[in-house]
Amino acid sequence: MASEVAQGRTHEELPRVLTATNALAIVVGIIIGSGIFLVPREMMAAVGSSRMVYAVWITGGLLSLFGAMSYAEVAAMRPRVGGEYAFLHDAYGPLTAFLYTWTWTMIAKPASIATIAAGLMRVLGTFPVFAFLDRAAVGHLMWSQGLAIAATWLITGLNIVSTRDSAQVQTLLTWLKVAMIVVIAGMCFASVKYGDWHNFSSGFQGARGGFAGFMIALIAALWAYDGWSDVSQMAGEVQKPQRSLPVALIGGVTIVGALYMLTNAAIQYVLPSAAIAAADRPATDALQLVAGNLGAGLVAVGMAVSIGATFVGSSLSGARVPFAAARDRLFPSVLGQIHPRFKTPWVSLLLQAVLSSLLLLAIGKFQALFSLAIFSEWLFYALTAATVFVFRVREPDANRPYRVTGYPVVPALFILAALVLLVFSFMDRPRESTAGALVILCGVPVHYLFQRSKAPGDKASDYVEQ
């Protein structure tokens, strides 16, 4: 089934203003947020040894790379706004595309943005001037929640005003944080006084261990790698997408994997396993030991810059999904509006900010938020990666600027790993996973009610060829 927009469709489209450099920076910038600084403790506490932590980082990196390679093939074939939404619609039809859009819009992206905002407040709380963040502001509302909501709206405003300027800000912040990561790692390795290569073979008692421990650590690692798919949602705004998207997806994940391994090695060179497992902020503790308050301050600034880049990019890309669905009449048409002056999907961006703010008010906790986001995202990661097989069978002669290396093994391994993660998520965090599943299932009646409520001649099938 082809899903090209019908020829009679004449409405304005988003302009292609993003360069290949912007696309690469979006991938790197969105992935490297707070994860590398906040999850090493969770990983070490789960697996209990430096070697197992490396095994988790490598496994998570390879899975993300396999997913990026699978997405690259489809994105280069179909460089449309909405990314995964468009791929799922073309492969499986409007119901699956609606369920993805519903889940993405109502839970996955708002939970992801709320997690980023909560992580930023966690970082700012390390500065004495922000010590008040852990106190109540009004009633049960914490200052950290209030400022996280304010930051969400500030970033949303930036993204509404200009896609090009937002991308340039995000690109600048991305390369700045890459430079700071290299400097931080270099300072650790330069510390002859505190560094110890024996730390890499150390372990500690008390870790959960076993398969359960490995999976808990892997979920944390995958959250740290999360975001590599977001650039596909802006495929319709990327210049020369057939070349730019594969380079951005595969190159971005590779760069991030190298930086994560470097950072993890730097921390472990300075801190033994037991110290990492006990530390709320292992990178900060390592630099505090090496360079005192100056080092700890450098890490905090680096984390703030890092999360800022993720914040801008994640908010920028996320709103393209409901925008694309609205343009195909699968979502309320108001979400498909383009701002007459700024040429951005401003209504979708506003909705995204509202839902993210509500999640921050309702939950506000870092751990619960990333558990909520991981489940729903990985279900649709698996379905989207599977479109590689669908299109290979259905359209064997289609032009493919990039073909996934290692087909069919690479996409199959990614899909299998995603399914294992989904099962484990239900076992380890049943409440959050059940909530995610219920949101998806609620989309089925919503889809049919929405289609029935529209006037004859205004159905999605009248605008999109099946």
What are these regions (language model features)?
Residues 1-41, 45-51, 58, 64-69, ...:
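Membrane-interface "cap" regions at the ends of multi-pass membrane proteins
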Residues 4-8, 12-14, 53-54, 70-98, ...:
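Flexible loop linkers connecting adjacent transmembrane helices
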Residues 8-14, 50-54, 131-143, 175-301, ...:
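Helix-loop-helix junctions that connect adjacent transmembrane segments
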Residues 42, 65-152, 157-160, 303-324, ...:
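Hydrophobic transmembrane alpha-helices that form the core helical bundles
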Residues 86-88, 93, 125-135, 204, ...:
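TM-loop-TM module centered on a large, flexible mid-protein loop between adjacent transmembrane helices
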Residues 124, 143-194, 208, 249, ...:
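Membrane-interface loop-to-helix entry segments
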Residues 181-184, 322, 373-400, 417-420, ...:
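Hydrophobic alpha-helical segments of multi-pass membrane transport proteins
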Residues 334-346, 381-432, 453, 465:
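C-terminal membrane-solvent junction of multi-pass transporters and transport-like membrane proteins
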